[in-house]
Amino acid sequence: VKYVILTHGGVTAPQTGPESCARAADDALGALDAGGEALAAAIAATARLEDDPRFNAGTGSNLRLDGRTIEMDAAVMASDGRFGAVACVERVKNPVLVAAKVLETPHLLLAGAGATAFARRLGFAEHDPVTEEARERHARALAALRGDGGDGEHTDDAARFHALTARRFWNFDAEPIECDTVGAVVRDAHGRFAAAASTGGSTYALRGRVGDVPLMGAGIYAGPHGAVAATGIGEEIARRLLARTVYDWLADGVAPARAAQRGVAMFPDVIAIGVLVVGRSGQAIASNRNMPSAQLVG
C-alpha cells in the first residue's frame, strides 16, 4: 500500500457531504503526489472541508449563543509526535492552517485572542466565516431556549438524536443543529501517519467553550502505529480520550476495523459518534449515525 486517505464531514452532517469529502481526499492525494508527507496531506484535506459552508468548520461554523461570536478549534498531529492546535481562534478562513503553524513553534496549543494574534502576525487575513445558514441555525437555537421552537416532532434519526441530546446535555428541546467536526487521517508511502481536525463548535455553548479537537488524544491522535480522528459531542469525546484510546488498541495489535467499532461502542446510543482509523494493517470508518466520508487507497 502506497497511501491511505480517509476524510469525514462530521457525524450527523448533511447527507450531501460525501462528494466534498471525496474532493478533500483528492486534495490530500495531490499533496502526497507533490512530495508532501502524511501531515501535509491531512492538512490539505481538512482545509478543503473547512471551505465547504455545509460543514461546521471554517466558513459555515456555528455561531455561539451570543449570536455574534464564532470561535473555531483545529488540530494537527504527525506520527513522530509533532502536534499543533488552536482553540477559540476567530475570523480566519482556515483554522487548520493556523494549527499547522503552531506545530512549528515550541508550543502545543494557542487559544483565544493569542491564537488570533498569532494568525495575524503570520499573515492570515481577516475572514468572516458567518453564513446565512449559520444565522438560521442560531435563530432555531434561540427559539428552543425561549421555548417557542423545537417541539420534538422530528421525522428522522438525526433530528431525533439532536432533540434527545439537547434535553440530555443542555436541558431543553431543539431543532437539529450540527455541532460536529471535519477531519482526515493519512498514511503515506513511507509509513508515516497523520491526523487533522477542525470544528466551529456548538451553538449551544458559551463564549470560550473548547471541545475535544485541540486536546491531544481526544479528537485526534497519531503515532507510529497509526492515526485516529473522532467526531461527536466534544465533551464526551474528551472525557474518554477517544482518539488516544483507539490508538492504544492499534498499538496492542487490534485490527483497525475492530478498534473503530470498539471506539464507537464506548458511547451510549444517544450520543452520535464517529471515528476514522488507519493503521499498519488497514483502515476503517465507523459511526453510529450518518457520517459523510471518503477513502482513497493506492
Language-model-derived ranges and their functions:
Residues V1-G298:
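Alpha/propeptide regions of enzymes that mature by internal proteolysis
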